[in-house]
């Protein structure tokens, strides 16, 4: 289980590497990814996350991996700027209406509720077999 903010500097390097590693071993890993944007540090991450959810709900693949390729100022607050960069990188046409849909908001809120229930307060946070992995590297030791 991974909780991550797409604009967190450590997440940008960690998450794509970890996900790619785990994808190569589908018999060993089931990846559960939860969006956990840290709004106070990276306000732009909230809209980026909602855009990613909207695109996933439309059936797009590899959204999570590509999300970490979106380069936007973490402090950006103009939704049109955030969405334009997201759509450019993803080659998509997500709109503000998509971000505000009840389905997207429900999914987004659910991710935050799961994080809250597990007392996640930072990113990236990794649980391996139900145990918090503070090193974030134990996945490489799975046999």
Locate the predicted segments by residue.
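Cysteine-centric redox/oxidoreductase cores and disulfide-bonded domains
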Residues: 38-123, 127-143
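A fold-wide structural signal in alpha/beta-hydrolase
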Residues: 27-32
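Typically the conserved alpha-helix immediately C-terminal to a functionally engaged Cys/Sec
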Residues: 4, 10-26, 37
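Acidic/histidine-rich, surface-exposed loop or edge segments in extracytoplasmic proteins
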Residues: 1-3, 34, 48
């Amino acid at each position: 289980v991974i909780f991550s903010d797409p604009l967190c500097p450590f997440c940008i390097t960690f998450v794509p590497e970890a996900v790619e590693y785990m994808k190569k071993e589908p018999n060993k890993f089931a990846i559960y990814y939860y969006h956990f944007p840290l709004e106070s540090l990276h306000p732009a991450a909230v809209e980026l996350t909602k855009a990613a959810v909207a695109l996933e709900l439309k059936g797009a693949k590899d959204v999570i991996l590509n999300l970490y390729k979106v380069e936007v100022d973490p402090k950006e607050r103009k939704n049109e700027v955030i969405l334009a960069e997201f759509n450019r990188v993803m080659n998509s046409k997500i709109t503000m209406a998509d971000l505000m849909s009840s389905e997207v908001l429900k999914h987004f809120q659910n991710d935050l509720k799961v994080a809250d229930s597990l007392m996640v307060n930072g990113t990236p946070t990794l649980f391996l077999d139900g145990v918090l992995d503070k090193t974030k590297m134990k996945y490489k030791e799975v046999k």
